[in-house]
Amino acid sequence: MSGDAPTPAHDPAAEGLEASVPLESVASMNSDEGQPSAQSAPLADNEARLQQLEQEHSSLREEHETLRSQYMRIAADFDNFRKRQSRDQDDLRLQLICTTLSEILPVVDNFERARQQLEPQGEEAQALHRSYQGLYKQLVEVLKQLGVASMRVVGQAFDPTLHEAVSREPSEEHPEDVVTEELQRGYHLNGRVLRHALVKVSMGPGPQSGASPSSAQSNDDSTATFQGEADPAEPGV
């Protein structure tokens, strides 16, 4: 009838093309169309994992640097502490030695006074004198081995770190502020002052001949305290 739709013409070429394409090829093409989306998911996961590892590595590196800095600081502090402890022990040991030797020095002074003042008479007295002088020499030798050395002060400029001035007196021989006499010997211990030397210090030239007798008498009185003291013996240490 004239109202019916036209029937498509039969195309033998199209039928042959459809028949020549296998069903497996069609299925393969359909699967290839969905494969890119399936591969992109693992790649994105790997990138995220890599970024996470990089962040962890950076964090661990910072932590390592922090710990290393702390270790170096602790090691330096410990080294300083060890050195300070060693110095403190040396100072304490030296202080103990100084304290002990300070108690022995008066004995040395007594030996020197006896050697200077005593004049033994007779063989027995001389034998006794030689006996205690032998003890004195042994004591001096021990002090030398410990590093003790006596000061030489007469004629030296007055130094308050080495000398203790007992009096000042005019002197025609020595200029002002020069040690004129040693009243008690001073000692060093390995370069450190063990005992200050008691000394008299020059005031420079004394009064001229025109000075009044009262002035001269006053100067004599200023040193009268030491006139009766024995002169120190020759250095023994």
From Swiss-Prot:
Enumerate the subcellular locations listed in this protein's record, separating them with semicolons.
Answer: Cytoplasm
Which keywords, in A-to-Z order, does the entry hold?
Chaperone, Cytoplasm, Stress response
GO molecular function terms attached to this record: adenyl-nucleotide exchange factor activity; protein homodimerization activity; protein-folding chaperone binding; unfolded protein binding
InterPro entries registered for this protein in UniProt:
GrpE, GrpE_coiled_coil, GrpE_head
Picking any one GO biological process from the record gives: protein folding
Q: Mind telling me which GO cellular component terms the entry cites?
A: cytoplasm
The annotated regions of Polar residues compositional bias extend over 27-40
Q: Name one Pfam family in it.
A: GrpE
For region Disordered, the annotated ranges are 1-52, 200-237
Q: Mind telling me which SUPFAM superfamilies this protein's record contains?
A: Coiled-coil domain of nucleotide exchange factor GrpE (SSF58014), Head domain of nucleotide exchange factor GrpE (SSF51064)
| PROSITE patterns, alphabetized | GRPE
Q: List, as start-end ranges, the regions of compositional bias called Low complexity.
A: 204-218
Describe the subunit structure.
Answer: Homodimer.
UniProt record similarity statement: Belongs to the GrpE family.
List the PANTHER family hit by this protein, alphabetically. Answer: GRPE PROTEIN, GRPE PROTEIN HOMOLOG, MITOCHONDRIAL
Q: Which HAMAP family match?
A: GrpE (MF_01151)
Q: What is this protein called?
A: Protein GrpE
